[in-house]
Amino acid sequence: MAALGCARLRWALRGAGRGLCPHGARAKAAIPAALPSDKATGAPGAGPGVRRRQRSLEEIPRLGQLRFFFQLFVQGYALQLHQLQVLYKAKYGPMWMSYLGPQMHVNLASAPLLEQVMRQEGKYPVRNDMELWKEHRDQHDLTYGPFTTEGHHWYQLRQALNQRLLKPAEAALYTDAFNEVIDDFMTRLDQLRAESASGNQVSDMAQLFYYFALEAICYILFEKRIGCLQRSIPEDTVTFVRSIGLMFQNSLYATFLPKWTRPVLPFWKRYLDGWNAIFSFGKKLIDEKLEDMEAQLQAAGPDGIQVSGYLHFLLASGQLSPREAMGSLPELLMAGVDTTSNTLTWALYHLSKDPEIQEALHEEVVGVVPAGQVPQHKDFAHMPLLKAVLKETLRLYPVVPTNSRIIEKEIEVDGFLFPKNTQFVFCHYVVSRDPTAFSEPESFQPHRWLRNSQPATPRIQHPFGSVPFGYGVRACLGRRIAELEMQLLLARLIQKYKVVLAPETGELKSVARIVLVPNKKVGLQFLQRQC
């Protein structure tokens, strides 16, 4: 769940400023062009006392803005921004500069460079400015959440939200809740199979996984089932689902278009309307939980209250006020849906194309959890291949193909000295497909993640080649529950069905619609296995 839509959208602008001057005098003034040549370096890998020539920033290639806009709007890369990473790395190498107005951005496209920056992060790592999200919060007097706040306040908020989520043992507490939602998912899957012409096909798995992920994360965060997996979805839930799409779809226009267009064109209003509906739905769920807690207090007194879940814990323990919860939980919700739904879609797509890996996974799953039994969190310690399938999927399709950091102090990277407030852009998509980090990088090879794999198996050659959940204190807050959620559902599916790609689906390509999604509907056939 690391990073969100605005990060991807703003990366599009990092390739170029809003003006047509590629890097004018103001941009050059942001960072000194030449650096002292005799200062000792503190770069990772440099031994004590090692001195080497520091490099001039003039050596770093610059991305021309006209080229970027031509590729974006004329050549059609607006939905292929991740592929621009591939083109730019081939042209400029693993590091290049681009500008957003006077602000310089340093794009990094190799695992060693990412590692150097990540290992020098401060106590309060700073993401790119979530300006559009903050504008909505400010207009409606809402508190900032974990993705919109920074500094010490972010640290305090993160410490509160970490509880009941961050540790594996804490995430395991949600196993029963996830399995309850998975039971309903399996029922809905069978209903859709039965309704298909073949009796075994689901025509749009990405949508079904999206509804599953939304149902699951709402149940975890708000302790409320919202009916996404029912035959007839409640009207307020339908409105909520549409509002998420409305917000994300109009984020692109809200990012690219100048502010003077907001009263004239409809996109900004639609963007705000989407957020308003999201927060309205969240407020309703929080208010219902507060009423439930008050009813318990009246009925049983303070000692009789049973803390039932995440939101209840945060409110009852005083970790968050209701107003703070209102600012934070919708942001966690936004991060929690796409990771699960997209990763599971891509995982089943690749498993359907590789029956040998799918059969090996089936044997592993039923060897630990026989048919008819429900997997539990402890079972996954004995399912290394299942974990490897998810890791390999996230390597090929990092949910958000870019991320960023604004450094809090002067740091050295690859011999270049960058001052405080430099913004680095992490090009995760091209890094995770780099042959120097992963052998046979374009192939789906889950066995590369297994310690006891055969010598001929493709290997992992750099630990920072794939970091889909981030690194350090700002790593993904919900990583453990996202992993558990995906493991539980994937195990159930492979335990019960053989998954086959529907003939009409064909080859898929990834499209950058905020996150990396398939370019068309993913139809899959689920053939029930014989016990």
From Swiss-Prot:
It is found in: Mitochondrion inner membrane. It is an enzyme of class 1 (oxidoreductase). Its cofactor is heme. Residues 384-398 are annotated as: Sterol-binding. Changing residue 405 to Q: In CTX; impairs sterol 26-hydroxylase activity. GO terms for molecular function: cholestanetetraol 26-dehydrogenase activity; cholesterol 26-hydroxylase activity; heme binding; iron ion binding; steroid hydroxylase activity; vitamin D3 25-hydroxylase activity. Heme binds at residue 476. One of its GO terms (cellular component) is mitochondrion. Keywords: Acetylation, Cataract, Cholesterol metabolism, Disease variant, Heme, Iron, Lipid biosynthesis, Lipid metabolism, Membrane, Metal-binding, Mitochondrion, Mitochondrion inner membrane, Monooxygenase, Oxidoreductase, Steroid biosynthesis, Steroid metabolism, Sterol metabolism, Transit peptide. It is a peripheral membrane protein. It catalyses: 5beta-cholestane-3alpha,7alpha,12alpha-triol + 6 reduced [adrenodoxin] + 3 O2 + 5 H(+) = (25R)-3alpha,7alpha,12alpha-trihydroxy-5beta-cholestan-26-oate + 6 oxidized [adrenodoxin] + 4 H2O; cholestanol + 2 reduced [adrenodoxin] + O2 + 2 H(+) = (25R)-26-hydroxycholestanol + 2 oxidized [adrenodoxin] + H2O; (25R)-3beta-hydroxycholest-5-en-7-one-26-al + 2 reduced [adrenodoxin] + O2 + H(+) = (25R)-3beta-hydroxycholest-5-en-7-one-26-oate + 2 oxidized [adrenodoxin] + H2O; (25R)-3beta,26-dihydroxycholest-5-en-7-one + 2 reduced [adrenodoxin] + O2 + 2 H(+) = (25R)-3beta-hydroxycholest-5-en-7-one-26-al + 2 oxidized [adrenodoxin] + 2 H2O. Residues 1-33 form a transit peptide. Gene3D superfamilies: Cytochrome P450. The modification N6-acetyllysine is found at residues 283, 509, 520. It comes from the Eukaryota. Interacts with HSP70; this interaction is required for initial targeting to mitochondria. Belongs to the cytochrome P450 family. This is Sterol 26-hydroxylase, mitochondrial. It comes from Homo sapiens. The gene is CYP27A1.
